[in-house]
Structures are given as structure tokens and as C-alpha cells.
């Protein structure tokens, strides 16, 4: 027992000695084995705070490292860096690094090109329209889809050329397209039976020259909302006979009888958007929507009323190729579509598809010219163009008035592909 206690005392004594002077022992060992080429000893906790912190790399330093060396710069071997940018490089996505959430460093942010920036809406006409919409419990796709042209369409001084896009059947859609900011629900609420009357009342107050009626998709309804659409058109024509009405509908799940019902309701233009080229449709639109079904909807509207103007819209910037664009336009012309519009896809939120490319104004103009050469009746093309953007101005000045012979001299030739009486109903 005595030997055992002696052993314990020895162990305790040695450990006590180690605890009292660990730094001295480490220093002693490091000095014993140190050489001139060895790495410096690991500093203790007390001394680490006195060492200078490593400076973070900067954006400027990264750019400098990516560029030519100093020798190349002086000798002029880096002349290729001074060559003028071609169009594709000049309009490439411009990115900057901005501070992210606390503790998460910086993140990449894409800047909008100057041609996509619009003023904040703030005018008397804009405020009045918004107040009426709230009072009558109406929705607009202008607000729900965060359209960049809302100040231009609602706040213009010329009411006769102004355009409003009323969204019927609620603000919740049964489909979920990857580009659209309208919220999605499997079973939205019931239709408002007063909506057709309220819509007609609002439009008669505003004195607009052109209105676009659109809607969320309502796959939960047996008719897809077609009767609601038709009733709204009839009410508008009763209260404001002079107003031009465009209906931008869904595909009614392929029920072409419902397409015909809306086409014969008294509207002036039947619109249904293909949104993108056929190859990208499965990635952009809800799986229940297909490019071919959209073509059949437009064909069904034309069959129901051959004199009707049919219209569609495409967004650019998803990554579509020229061959895919040509193919889409050829199929649209084969379906006798009269009007097509091109606009830039703008990502509404982070959960939606990212923008693949900001298409330049020059390229939009090129596609406008190409579409006109293919025989489309009218083409609106530009970064901020939307399906209903300045639709009244476009149709009144470029299609409807021309068809009615407004401003033509006696004996002048008047285009009559679409009968006047069909447009005046």
C-alpha cells in the first residue's frame, strides 16, 4: 500500500510540474531543435492577438491578377485587351458584388441595362385608376405581374391611347409557370358574380380607348372561366360601345368550344401567348401548357370568327437560339396568327427562372423586321414591350384605323383583309 501511494504521489508531482510551466517546456524544446530554415513556432493564445491580420482580397486586386503582367503591359504584348468590344460583349450581363446577409459574405448581383430602367409611377391618372380598382375589388395583371410599364400605360395624358389590363377570376392561378409572379393555388376561391359589371363600370369611368382582359388559369372550373370572360365583354360593350376589347386567354385545357365561345362574344382581338420557343416551353411554362396546344387555341379562335385578329407574345432572354425563333415564327404564321410581340423576360423574384440574356434593342428591332417580312400584320418589339403594352396605340394607329380607311384620300387603296363590320361590333 505504501508503494502504491508513493507511485501516485510521484505521478501527481510530475503532472503538477508540467501544468505549472507548459510554455517554458515548449520554448525549451523549440530552441533545442530549431534551425535557421524551420518554420516559426505556433504562437500561443496570448501572443496571437498581437500579430497583424491577413488583409482580405479586393475586387481591384482580383482584376489586376487576371490582367497582363507588368512586363507584358510595358512591352505592349497585351494589346488585345484594348481592342473594341463587339456587340455581344458590350451588352453582356454586368455583375457587381454586393454585401449579402450578415455573416455570409458578398454575392453576385446583375445590373439592369439602362434601357430597362423605368420611372416610378406617380401621376394623378395612375392614382385615380388604382383607387377605382381597389374600390371595385378588381385585379390587374399590371400589378400582379409587376409590369415595368405601369406608369406609362396608366399615367399617360392621352386617355384614348392609354391601356389597362384587367385580370379576371381572382389573383390566384391553378398553374405555376416559372416566369410568372402571380401566386399559385390548387383550388382558388369562387368567382365574383359582380366582376363583369364592376369591370364595365370602371372602364366606362376611365374613358380608355383600349382594354385588355386577361385572367388567371382556372383549371378547377368546368369551363375554365370562358362564360365569365364572355359576360364581361358583353357588359363592357353595353356600357362603352366605342372601347376596343382584347381578350388574352389561357388554353382552357384544350376545350376549343370554350375558345369559340369567347371568340364570338363581341371582342376585337383574341390573344393567347405562346410565351417562348417550342424547345424551351417545358422548362418555362407549366407542364399542362404546350406550344402545340397554344397554336391550336389560336387556330380555333380564327375558325370560330375568321375576321378576328389573333395575337400572341413571346419573351426573349430565356436562352433561345435563332433557329428556334425562326421555327416558332414559321409555325405561328402557318396558324394564321396576325400579330406578334417580343419583349425582354424580367425575373420577378429569386425563385423564378434567371435571365439568360438581356437582349439588345438592336436585336429586338431585327426580329421586328424579320417578322414583318414573314407577313405578320403588326409587330411590336422592344425590351419593355409586353403583350398589352400600348396595345391601344398599336392597334388603333396601325391596324384598326387603317382597316377603316381613316385618313385616306378618296380613291386611295384601303386594305380590307379584316372586314370593317367585324371590328366595329
From Swiss-Prot:
Keyword set, alphabetical order: 4Fe-4S, Iron, Iron-sulfur, Metal-binding, Mitochondrion, S-adenosyl-L-methionine, Transferase, Transit peptide
InterPro entries listed in its UniProt record: Aldolase_TIM (IPR013785), Elp3/MiaA/NifB-like_rSAM (IPR006638), LIAS_N (IPR031691), Lipoyl_synth (IPR003698), rSAM (IPR007197)
Identification of the protein by name: Lipoyl synthase, mitochondrial
Region Disordered, residue ranges: 17-55
Keyword tRNA processing in record: no
Catalysed conversion reaction: [[Fe-S] cluster scaffold protein carrying a second [4Fe-4S](2+) cluster] + N(6)-octanoyl-L-lysyl-[protein] + 2 oxidized [2Fe-2S]-[ferredoxin] + 2 S-adenosyl-L-methionine + 4 H(+) = [[Fe-S] cluster scaffold protein] + N(6)-[(R)-dihydrolipoyl]-L-lysyl-[protein] + 4 Fe(3+) + 2 hydrogen sulfide + 2 5'-deoxyadenosine + 2 L-methionine + 2 reduced [2Fe-2S]-[ferredoxin]
Cysteine-cysteine disulfides: none
Originating organism: Talaromyces marneffei (strain ATCC 18224 / CBS 334.59 / QM 7333) (Penicillium marneffei)
Family per similarity comment: Belongs to the radical SAM superfamily. Lipoyl synthase family.
Lineage of source species: Eukaryota, Fungi, Dikarya, Ascomycota, Pezizomycotina
Cofactor: [4Fe-4S] cluster
Textual note on the cofactor: Binds 2 [4Fe-4S] clusters per subunit. One cluster is coordinated with 3 cysteines and an exchangeable S-adenosyl-L-methionine.
GO molecular function, a single term: metal ion binding
Pfam families: LIAS_N, Radical_SAM
Amino acid at each position: 500500500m505504501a508503494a502504491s501511494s508513493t507511485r501516485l504521489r510521484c505521478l501527481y508531482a510530475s503532472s503538477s510540474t508540467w501544468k505549472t510551466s507548459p510554455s517554458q517546456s515548449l520554448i525549451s524544446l523549440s530552441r533545442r531543435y530549431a534551425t535557421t530554415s524551420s518554420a516559426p513556432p505556433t504562437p500561443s493564445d496570448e501572443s496571437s492577438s498581437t500579430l497583424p491580420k491577413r488583409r482580405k482580397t479586393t475586387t481591384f486586386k482580383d482584376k489586376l491578377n487576371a490582367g497582363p503582367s507588368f512586363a507584358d503591359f510595358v512591352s505592349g504584348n497585351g494589346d488585345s485587351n484594348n481592342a473594341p468590344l463587339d456587340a455581344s460583349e458590350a451588352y453582356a450581363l454586368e455583375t457587381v458584388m454586393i454585401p449579402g446577409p450578415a455573416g455570409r459574405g458578398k454575392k453576385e448581383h446583375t445590373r439592369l441595362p439602362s434601357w430597362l430602367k423605368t420611372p416610378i409611377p406617380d401621376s394623378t391618372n395612375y392614382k385615380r385608376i388604382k383607387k377605382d380598382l381597389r374600390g371595385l375589388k378588381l385585379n390587374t395583371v399590371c400589378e400582379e405581374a409587376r409590369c415595368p410599364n405601369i406608369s406609362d400605360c396608366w399615367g399617360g395624358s392621352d386617355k384614348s391611347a392609354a391601356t389597362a389590363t384587367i385580370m379576371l377570376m381572382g389573383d390566384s392561378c391553378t398553374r405555376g409557370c416559372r416566369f410568372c409572379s402571380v401566386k399559385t393555388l390548387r383550388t382558388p376561391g369562387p368567382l365574383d358574380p359582380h366582376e363583369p359589371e364592376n369591370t364595365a363600370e370602371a372602364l366606362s369611368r376611365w374613358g380608355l380607348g383600349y382594354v385588355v382582359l386577361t385572367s388567371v388559369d382556372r383549371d378547377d372550373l368546368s369551363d375554365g372561366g370562358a362564360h365569365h370572360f364572355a359576360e364581361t365583354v358583353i357588359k363592357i360593350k353595353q356600357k362603352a360601345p366605342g372601347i376596343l376589347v382584347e381578350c388574352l386567354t389561357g388554353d382552357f385545357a384544350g376545350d376549343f368550344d370554350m375558345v369559340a365561345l369567347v371568340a364570338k362574344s363581341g371582342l376585337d382581338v383574341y390573344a393567347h401567348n405562346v410565351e417562348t420557343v417550342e424547345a424551351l416551353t417545358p422548362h418555362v411554362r407549366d407542364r399542362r401548357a404546350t406550344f402545340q396546344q397554344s397554336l391550336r387555341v389560336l387556330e380555333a379562335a380564327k375558325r370560330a370568327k375568321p375576321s378576328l385578329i389573333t395575337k400572341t407574345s413571346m419573351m426573349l432572354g430565356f436562352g433561345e437560339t435563332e433557329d428556334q425563333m425562326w421555327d416558332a415564327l414559321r409555325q405561328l404564321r402557318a396558324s394564321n396568327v396576325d400579330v406578334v410581340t417580343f419583349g425582354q423576360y424580367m425575373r420577378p423574384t429569386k425563385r423564378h427562372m434567371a435571365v439568360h440574356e438581356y437582349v439588345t434593342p438592336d436585336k429586338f428591332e431585327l426580329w421586328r423586321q424579320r417578322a414583318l417580312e414573314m407577313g405578320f400584320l403588326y409587330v411590336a418589339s422592344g425590351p419593355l414591350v409586353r403583350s398589352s403594352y400600348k396595345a391601344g396605340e398599336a392597334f388603333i394607329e396601325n391596324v384598326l384605323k387603317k382597316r377603316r380607311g381613316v385618313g385616306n384620300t378618296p380613291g386611295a387603296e384601303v386594305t380590307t383583309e379584316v372586314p370593317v363590320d367585324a371590328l366595329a361590333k
